[in-house]
Amino acid sequence: MSDTSATKTEIRVIIVGGSVAGLTLAHCLAKANISHVVLEKRAEISPQEGAFLGIWPNGGRIFDQLGVYADLEQCTVPIHTMRVRFPDGFSFSSELPRCVQERFGYPIVSLDRQKVLEILHDRYPAKSNIHINKRVTEIRQTEREAQVVTDDGAVYKGDLVVGADGIHSAVRAEMWRQAKGLVGRRDGQAFAVEYACVFGISTPIPGLESGEHVNSYSDGLCVITFHGKDGRIFWFILIKLHKRFVYPKTPRFSASDAAKVCAEYASVPVWGEICVRDLWRNKTSASMTALEEGLLKTWNFKRVVLLGDSIHKMTPNIGQGANTAAEDAAVLASLLQRLSTSASSTTSGTIDAVLREYVSLRYKRVKSTYQRAYFGARLHTRDNVLKCFVGRYIFPRFSQQVLERTSQAIAGAPLVDFLPTPKRSGAGWSDYAGSPEVGAPTVPWLVISLPVLASVLCYLMFA
């Protein structure tokens, strides 16, 4: 662990966005004694929007380093069993979540996004650094500093501006404006929408047991539930849209749209005799949103850098959005802490070098996570004949291989490198260390599929 009291270089960081990404970075910087402010455009840090998020071991270990994991853990129960249902009535169960916890020391959990933000805010040691009602209108950059201008006329000065302001990022828009000609057409059209999602939270439903997780797959649709503390049900319904939209020309949805979707699919089975109508009937909150997907190539320009959903946006199917944002924050903070304890200056060249290293350390892993989420959404909604086959006949028969690939993906996660590794970390971190990044299933998986396909065809032909 580095001695943060030996700071030689004063760094000032302006974080735009009081999101999970932004507040996690703020916690990291506070631990490193690096000066920073958080600018949030909304009037409150933790509004109730009906959304929830999953915390996997790769995110949980970082939150544990920051001293907030115990509070998060008290709000939920570990997921120990996964249940999967297909439209033909076939179903199977897996202990993958329990095995993941045994290997890595942290469970898979789900809880309200509002509660996560509330805990991150409540446990943050310098609340005077957080400013609400601060909508960014302009970013200025010079050789000596960056300036962020907000709609109330305030000007914030720093060495670095971090865009943690989500998919509709004002920081990204300013970066693109200033880097015109350097940001390619690909990045300008990187985010697209093929799916919409209804998120909801419901009161307990008999038959959906705490600690279990259900995946119900249909053609063009999937229903996924997580059953938390006191039986609360966190759920989402992923729907394939009739066309592909390119951001920012994407659809918007209202509460009435969510109601219409749940009415249309009311009879879709979830598990046993439970259907979508039961989730909707017991809801305490629900909302509907378009799901942007995309990964940018350009993450930084001079003194501006992006993290979280502002650069990589994925569907919720593999539950890695918040975890990947926490990883971003851990890596960026670790590099800034290293700079703060060096004798280097904070010229544009020095800052640019740090940001380039951040991108170099993160891009490959983020890309693999994005690919897995992209594949997962299409597998779960049975997007084509191959994915129908792989989901129905391959994954149920290769559960151990799925666990191994999941373990490899988790083990590659970074830490806040100037903070101690939590004692509860399991042996899986070292057992699977050095594994190659795990993306979507590719040729080897398809080769494995061939003998199974042959046996299925023989059964259909001669049974």
UniProtKB/Swiss-Prot annotation:
Q: Tell me its EC number(s), please.
A: 1.-.-.-
| Membrane-spanning ranges | 443-463
Q: Which residues bind FAD?
A: 40, 54, 113, 309, 322
Q: Which GO terms describe its cellular component?
A: membrane
Please tell me which top-level EC class this enzyme sits in: oxidoreductase
Places the protein is found = Membrane
Q: Which GO terms describe its molecular function?
A: FAD binding; monooxygenase activity
How does this chain sit within the bilayer? Single-pass membrane protein
Which InterPro entries does the entry mention? FAD-bd, FAD/NAD-bd_sf, FAD_mOase_fung
Tell me the function of this protein. FAD-dependent monooxygenase; part of the gene cluster that mediates the biosynthesis of calidodehydroaustin, a fungal meroterpenoid. The first step of the pathway is the synthesis of 3,5-dimethylorsellinic acid by the polyketide synthase ausA. 3,5-dimethylorsellinic acid is then prenylated by the polyprenyl transferase ausN. Further epoxidation by the FAD-dependent monooxygenase ausM and cyclization by the probable terpene cyclase ausL lead to the formation of protoaustinoid A.
* Active site residues according to the UniProt entry: 217
**Some GO term, biological process aspect, for this entry: which one?**
terpenoid biosynthetic process
Give the UniProt keywords, A-Z. Answer: FAD, Flavoprotein, Membrane, Monooxygenase, Oxidoreductase, Transmembrane, Transmembrane helix
**Cofactor list:** FAD
This chain belongs to the protein called: FAD-dependent monooxygenase ausM
Family stated for the protein in its record: Belongs to the paxM FAD-dependent monooxygenase family.
A Pfam family of this chain: FAD_binding_3
The record's misc note reads:
In A.calidoustus, the austinoid gene cluster lies on a contiguous DNA region, while clusters from E.nidulans and P.brasilianum are split in their respective genomes. Genetic rearrangements provoked variability among the clusters and E.nidulans produces the least number of austionoid derivatives with the end products austinol and dehydroaustinol, while P.brasilianum can produce until acetoxydehydroaustin, and A.calidoustus produces the highest number of identified derivatives.
Biological pathway:
Secondary metabolite biosynthesis; terpenoid biosynthesis
